[in-house]
Design a protein with these regions (language model features):
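Short arginine-rich
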Residues: 76
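Short S/T/G/P-rich N-terminal loop/turn motif that feeds into the first structured element of a domain
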Residues: 1-37, 43-50, 55-67, 83-95
Length: 95
């Protein structure tokens, strides 16, 4: 299994728009071949900070996800909302 965790910090006034955009991205991503799970969280104390937790069949599926049209569209739409570049970390499950 291959896991991807993305921390997304948007401008405080953009939290609602980001939540809508990210929710749509999650719904589309869950339909992809190789997607085991894809979850979105909003930080309780800081609602303009989001976390995705993605589980993919393998690294190839995660890489394919990044080249889909819906990811490209989401990145383009989210650009003006970002307060900082997203932190994206990939992990391989060991145990």
């Amino acid at each position: 299994m291959h896991y991807v965790l993305a921390r997304i910090t948007v401008k405080p006034e953009a939290a609602d728009a980001a939540r809508q955009l990210l929710t749509t991205l999650v719904e589309q991503s869950r339909k992809e071949e190789g997607c085991v799970s894809y979850e979105l969280y909003q930080q309780a104390a800081t609602p303009h900070v989001f976390q995705t937790v993605e589980q993919w069949k393998d690294e190839a599926a995660a890489k394919a996800h990044m080249s889909t049209s819906h990811v490209g569209a989401a990145i383009a739409a989210a650009g003006p909302l970002f307060a900082a570049p997203p932190e994206i970390l990939a992990y391989n499950k060991l145990a």
